[in-house]
Amino acid sequence: MGIIFSKFFSMILIRAMGLNLTSHFFNSPQSIFSTVFVFIAAMIILSIQVILFVWRTPMSELIKTEYRLPIKKMKMTPFRTLMGVLGLILLGVGYYLSLTLRETWTNYITYTQDFSAILWIPLLILFCCITATYLFFDCSLPALLYFLSKPKKRLIKGAKLIAYNNVRAYLQRTWKSYALLTIITAIAISLIGGTMGVISLNYQATNRIYPTSFQVSGEQAGALRTLLEKSDVPITAEQAIPYKMTNMTVQTRYLGELQDESVENMMVNLVALSDYQRLRKLVPGAPEIRLSTDKQAVLFDSQYDVTRSFITYRDEVKVGSQHNFKLIQAEQDYFGDSALRYSLPNVLVIQDEAYQQIKGFTYTIAYLQTEKVQTDALTQLLDEELPIEWAHPLTYEFSDDQKNVRFYPETARDSSSDSGQTTAYRLTLANRFTTMRGVRRQAGIILFVSLFVGVIVLITTSSSLIVRQFSNTEREKYNYRLLTKLGYTRNEVRKLVYWQNIWIFMPGTLLAILHAVFAINTFTQIIDSPGYWVAHLFAAVAAVVYLFAYLITVKLCLRIIET
């Protein structure tokens, strides 16, 4: 089985990483010996634990066959009821903070200027959920079962009444381990879901940075076309987008600032609306924008998915010395690799008429889409003939009033001078194939490890509950048989087993999934991405795993009772 599963997981790893390898089935004596050694070591450790247990436990306790319910401990005192209510309150506080994390940060930091809240509020959410989990199984759930078994206006009898009391007795013995299993399951789902969400986020971000097969500076576009023709790689689509670099004054407000806005003077790349529409033909995922007047603009920021939680822009922006625009929306960057542009992340889309009126330094980036999958031979040819390097230096300096910019193309700043000049460079080429291959292989390794660990945790926790129920059923099978002698039918006893196991599996499963879902929602409050649907999918998979564990437990428990 170990060899078969090893083969299975190696195939998953090769597929996830996109490797061009063949996984052969072979017999590994070293793996067999290592597995045998691990089993022997585990048996030795288990034997030592059993010996210590027998040595420390009195003989009278070992040979005792009857089991007495902890009736005194099962009593619901006012204090336990109060602690049960407190557990539900803590659970609600944790869930509420996870839903309103961004607003809580903003309001608290605005009034206190305590930026440590960025750290301790998520830790407070974690503390509330963990504490509430233990209180839930120690006090809240037993209190609920107690009140369900004490009806006032209706009569509860038969299987449900017995099931409620059996579950209360079970929780009294195992509430600590049950709470721990729930927390471990929630953490496993959260980490796996969070990992897969981050992988999806990274993949989508990389796909957004490299929307086409190649991005190349206008100066090297001809050389790239020649190399692609030599390699028999046809170009299916191409767009050359001009950018105009100039200065922009924008008013921003950071999280927690008491003042209205901070004025920032930065460099920006301008793009005409018609050029943006041409780019959208190659990048269909880019949002559609409409500028009704020549005084409206849309800002694209490569860090917007992260900074949107901490920075807000004011509507009015000023480009150059005298051109004012109204910022109608802010979006993520869909213009490809920002390293191919001067002034890096910011791109401002404006009407064509306004674009022509503004002065600045103009340069071009060509976006090429190819049909064939890039081969290693083409990759090596590009590395030799058209290496990726920082080139095209552009030196610029602001005027004394910070309203105008003077440019010095193809000139690097003299490092010995203190003239206030700044030199910017840009990359010559961006290759989608090599970058996406590296991202996929890295994501494949992380995905393989996270899924392997997560599946092991789910199987271990569900198996632990199954084994505990087997032990509990074996100990109480004579009580079940006694019920048949007291007049309960076979269907009523089976209903009791179904109903009791529902209360064993359902609360922990629902609570673990709720913890995981709200934890994932906390992640979305920090970094927004559509990739978190994978995390919710894995939470559904966990629910299915526990459903199968429940069905297996019920069937085997019935077999133990009825044989």
Predicted regions and their residues:
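Short helix-loop junctions at transmembrane helix boundaries
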Residues: 2-32, 92-108, 114-117, 504, ...
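Alpha-helical transmembrane segments, especially those used as permease/efflux helices
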Residues: 37-41, 72-202, 515, 537-556
